[in-house]
């Protein structure tokens, strides 16, 4: 079994810490040296993607130190224990099995006589069969008419990931004639969110997916009641318009208020559930089960790469190690995720939850305080929009923020126009290439207001086109990166106690069980 130790107790980390500022990236990326780095520092990913880290502050010395850290921290051994069913979520005493929802990397994992790989595949098949029946008109509304829109009601991991994936493939599906149903999402307990979505759909032809593992999530049940009320007012039977995605032990599981129930379990956390049955329901309804299967295939292929002990052939682990070097040695406080693809407009928000909810911890997996910084702040926007928003701080601010670019050679719809000898897609790609070099190399100017120091590190993931398979690989890459970083920091990346306290206090407010500042704030908001 692997040994779990704090980062600052590892000899390899002490050696790595001696390499602070070792590479001057402005110098390393200049001229022909930079050209050679771009060719050299590149690692294949799954589904035709490539992870290029030429503009990161690494060289052979730093990479060797990172490899030694990976070995001493036993990263691959810990990953193997995870996918073979060890109790990695120490806080909740649970296994962590989201990889098993897309592939089997190791041994059978059996719980109470149930093979978990078979269970996850069965739930995905259940979602696929339901979607096929809806598309074929075998499952219809009260009047025997086909459903045309599907609306998911959920919050957190039940919203951010599925929403990001749907938006990512919406145009691809149109271009490839796989659009089956329009999808929408209700997440916030703010009534304006639900009201706006309901006003935009034809209720008689709308199908609603209620997603709550526990069946008790306040925001989700509140929004479900909001939707049921609207359906009843429209003279419709809610039970003919709703299905549930929940656990087998939740109150929703055997309720007759739903057309069917698709099950998830406690071994896949919400933020890691985008390639499980949970997201499979809405994505299969929107695009067809075959498209969701391609997402799973891309993720599975990336997972297999993540088992390689050689960091130069394991893009997920390499990205994680470089991130730890930037956070703990270089002292950078944040990471910006910058997809130069409008289709990935909600991907940074999903990664924000996945990363910050996983590694935003100040105690190790044994509940002991750590004496080093852990997860960075994650934020981002698609390019080129972000260039006209927060890039000013990234270029000339007092903090250095590492950047993770994502770019594709082709657009999804293939509709473009040539203006001034270049297409819109070429202009988009030109901007991302220019930004990488501008951040790394900067530009000297005697006017300090126009001087760019450079030295801002970045990586880029590139591909031919954003497809279901490449989207799955992209998602798995970042999930695995977050996992490896949690291993290095000796954290439990799979619980989220920070979400709970506010929920408890909110229930007190609603029950009017308040005093002190909580009472004054409640009165201020007229609760």
Model feature map: region roles:
Residues 129-137, 143-309, 508:
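Glycine-rich phosphate-binding loops that contact phosphosugars or nucleotide phosphates
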Residues 11, 36, 57, 61, ...:
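Conserved active-site and cofactor/substrate-binding residues in soluble primary-metabolism enzymes
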Residues 230-415, 454, 501-527:
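Active-site phosphate/pyrophosphate-binding segments
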Residues 4-143, 421-429, 440-441, 463, ...:
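Extended, charge-enriched "interface" segments that sit outside catalytic cores
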Residues 450, 466-518:
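C-terminal structured subdomain/cap of oxidoreductase catalytic cores
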Residues 148-156, 208-214, 334-341, 378, ...:
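Short glycine-rich or small-residue beta-strand-to-loop segments that form or flank ligand, phosphate
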Residues 415-450:
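Acidic, Ser/Thr-rich peripheral helices and adjacent loops at domain boundaries
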Residues 2-74, 313, 317-329, 344, ...:
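Flexible, glycine-rich loop/tail regions that form catalytic "lids" or insertion modules at the edges
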